[in-house]
């Protein structure tokens, strides 16, 4: 039985070999293809012959050369090697064994290329570049700049660049301590010069925008400008702006100044008569209670805002509006913690002070003066408490000195007597500060001095 099967296979092989030779002889390209023929090595191309051993070598050579490796097509299947347009060869000895093929597995010999073309006029070079480009998006320059800024942002120095306190004097506040406190203070910059201030920002940030329009059309207001400082970050800088005096305010101030001149009892304001050097000038000042002074003090009490219970940090940067819940309107305030107001002399226990600003609605030239301790709490009594100024330094520094500062000097720094005439404001009923024990101690020291 096995012998019969072997003979059948042998006959089948001979049949296929005969068919193979017949196809080779009948191919029109066999004579022109040197890789599939051995005729090129013969001296003559008209005829050829070979013995049985040569015949076997010829068949082996033809089998090896007539079937190159299968080419891979983009359509996903393998094509058979063709010798011509009308014939094909079936390479049974090299035909792969399909009995153990996994139909569900992926074919590693299949390559698929997906190409996206924008238009019919796209050039081949562009198509090749698209095939070789990575699939992830390329970061934009803005994103790269933000990354560089974010990486270096913790190293930025904000001490000399943000929120410049606008002042033409060497004033200071809680962001800019006094020089006597052994702290290194950055130099102030004024906005009166045309030269732009220098900043220590890292490269890559946007330019400063132009200054905004002044917040008021007359009087004193503020301006702002911004710049980008990274992702979802905007730096803001502000400064004060002084516009022309509002219409009618000159008449208001002139009338008030005339009334202030009556504080001495005559129309010619004479501070020498009011604060004459005698045995007890403080007592004389305390007993000066004219009818006009009473009316003026009543106007001051009704016109001025109440002191806030804690230091409003927004005034440290520039003039700020703060809502007064008792008067039910906004008042403008300015920091008054610097040497210009002589804080360390007249209010020795105060750390910060603020002063209200004049407005067109003001019926007097007075200003509210409030002082705070190291914890930013309002000082309601004692030698560090702020007292109302009958003449605001904003209107006249000279008159302010004569009306508000000289009485303190005449009383030789006895705040207990001074505060009897100019009581500190606590209209918002803030917690009494300092404590009762500290207050009594300060009071006793003032009497003994």
Curated annotation (Swiss-Prot):
Domain of life: Eukaryota
Record has Disulfide bond as a keyword: yes
Residue stretches making up the TSP type-1 domain: 203-247
Low complexity bias (residue ranges): 27-53
Localization per record: Secreted
Any one Pfam family match given in the protein's UniProt record, by short name: TSP_1
Entry GO CC: extracellular region
Leader peptide range in chain numbering: 1-26
Residue segments, region Disordered: 27-55
Annotated glycosylation sites: 33, 270
GO biological process: negative regulation of angiogenesis
Chief site of localization: secreted
Domain AMOP residues, every copy: 274-437
Annotated function: May act as an angiogenesis inhibitor.
Comment text on domains: The C-terminal AMOP domain plays an important role in the anti-angiogenic function of ISM1.
Protein name as catalogued: Isthmin
Source species: Xenopus laevis (African clawed frog)
Upper taxonomic lineage: Eukaryota, Metazoa, Chordata, Craniata, Vertebrata
Gene field: ism1
């Amino acid at each position: 039985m096995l012998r019969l099967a072997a003979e059948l296979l042998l006959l089948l092989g001979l049949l296929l070999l005969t068919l193979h030779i017949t196809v080779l002889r009948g191919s029109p390209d066999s004579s022109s293809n040197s890789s599939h023929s051995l005729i090129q090595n013969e001296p003559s191309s008209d005829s050829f012959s070979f013995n049985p051993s040569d015949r076997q070598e010829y068949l082996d050579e033809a089998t090896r050369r007539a079937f190159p490796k299968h080419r891979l097509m983009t359509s996903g299947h393998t094509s058979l090697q063709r010798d011509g347009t009308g014939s094909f060869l079936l390479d049974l000895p090299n035909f792969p064994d399909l009995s153990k093929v996994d139909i569900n597995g992926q074919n590693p010999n299949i390559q698929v290329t997906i190409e996206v073309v924008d238009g019919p006029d796209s050039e081949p070079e562009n198509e090749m570049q698209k095939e070789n480009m990575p699939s992830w998006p390329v970061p934009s320059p803005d994103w790269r700049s933000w990354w560089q800024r974010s990486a270096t942002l913790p190293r930025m120095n904000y001490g000399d660049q943000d929120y410049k306190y606008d002042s033409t004097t060497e004033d200071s506040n809680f962001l800019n301590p006094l020089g006597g406190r052994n702290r290194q203070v950055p130099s102030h910059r004024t906005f009166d010069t045309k030269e732009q201030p220098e900043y220590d920002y890292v490269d890559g940030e946007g330019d400063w925008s132009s200054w905004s329009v002044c917040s008021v059309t007359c009087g004193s207001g503020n301006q702002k400008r911004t710049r980008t400082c990274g992702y979802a970050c905007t730096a803001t800088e502000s400064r004060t702006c002084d516009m022309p005096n509002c219409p009618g305010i000159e008449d208001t101030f002139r009338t008030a100044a005339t009334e202030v001149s009556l504080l001495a009892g005559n129309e010619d304001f004479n501070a020498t008569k009011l604060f004459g050097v005698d045995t007890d000038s403080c007592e004389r000042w305390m007993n000066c209670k004219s009818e006009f002074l009473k009316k003026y003090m009543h106007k001051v009490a009704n016109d001025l805002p109440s002191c806030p219970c804690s230091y409003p940090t927004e005034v440290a940067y520039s003039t700020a509006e703060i809502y007064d819940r008792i008067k039910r309107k906004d008042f403008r305030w300015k920091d008054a913690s610097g040497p210009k107001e002589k804080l360390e002399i007249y209010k020795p226990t105060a750390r910060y002070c603020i002063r209200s600003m004049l407005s067109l609605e003001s019926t007097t030239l007075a200003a509210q003066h409030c002082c705070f301790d190291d914890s930013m709490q309002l000082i309601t009594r004692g030698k560090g408490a702020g007292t109302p100024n009958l003449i605001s330094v904003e209107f006249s520094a000279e008159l302010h000195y004569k009306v508000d500062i000289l009485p303190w000097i005449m009383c030789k720094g006895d705040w207990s007597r001074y505060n009897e005439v100019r009581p500190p404001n606590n209209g918002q009923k803030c917690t009494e500060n300092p404590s009762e024990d500290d207050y009594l101690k300060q009071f006793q020291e003032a009497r003994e001095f």
